[in-house]
């Protein structure tokens, strides 16, 4: 039995006593205890692949702040890693793949990994975290979106131009669609396995959807997000596991995403929540969308911006605060002050009381 079900109620647009709050990258390098755990573990991957350490890191922010959810400590690139691309990290450069896929032959060789063998460490982490949370707050599981995973798989790492994947979109769209289809199959299986292991809400991160033109977004990202929303088995009625579709730069697509079949849409700070709520038209809950850079501001500035964000949502939602999960518009940065996170959480709780 969940002691705090605010997140699940808000994602299902049910009444809550205050707006729930959690933060993307709430378990991360801004916390000294995270840095100590990482130093002990040796690397990011050795933390993510050890269920007990992944659990320890997942719980760290909840031991400091009264957050309304835990999010699994993992990485969006676990799926391509399990497909054989071999993930590694370069200090200062981020994730890389030793075996990127750049032609039809390599793409056609890819298969959906087995979730309880190649990705068992993720499912074991979900199980351990659920046990340790002991019903205190819900656990969010997640995956990268098909488009975002394909970006990394083809580029071989992060990119500024996305030249390789965009060239494939123009020159061999059928090959790219084959890759996106395979990755979508894997994402659906991955999220279903996390749900079976105990995840109580699920989020898809379409981090790079915003680099596409509207026509390309509607061809190479949105249809695959919609397929996930339609095909991912999430249960029925009160037991249904809510699905959040988050994207950077997705504000112009809120109406499309609201029609996808997901329970909620997460937006970044480049659209006002008032505008996003009007576009959503009450069909989905909204999550977001404070600019993470606000945490560099003074405590007073943070409180002011939290109030503006809460009010913006209500303004676009007919005066009601229901159906909103407070979050940042993207993940936290390593140089942010943990005390400012405490200010943010306290402000959300105080200012959103019903």
Curated annotation (Swiss-Prot):
One GO process term, biological-process aspect: protoporphyrinogen IX biosynthetic process from glutamate
Pathway noted in the entry: Porphyrin-containing compound metabolism; protoporphyrin-IX biosynthesis; coproporphyrinogen-III from 5-aminolevulinate: step 4/4
Intracellular or extracellular location(s): Cytoplasm
Molecular function terms, GO-annotated: uroporphyrinogen decarboxylase activity
Catalytically driven reaction(s): uroporphyrinogen III + 4 H(+) = coproporphyrinogen III + 4 CO2
Keyword Lyase: yes
Site positions for Transition state stabilizer: 75
Alphabetical list of PROSITE patterns matching this protein: UROD_1 (PS00906), UROD_2 (PS00907)
Coiled-coil blocks: none
Role this protein plays: Catalyzes the decarboxylation of four acetate groups of uroporphyrinogen-III to yield coproporphyrinogen-III.
Subunit structure, as described in the record: Homodimer.
Family membership: Belongs to the uroporphyrinogen decarboxylase family.
HAMAP family the record matches: URO_D
Name of the featured protein: Uroporphyrinogen decarboxylase
Lineage: Bacteria, Pseudomonadati, Pseudomonadota, Gammaproteobacteria, Lysobacterales
Gene designation: hemE
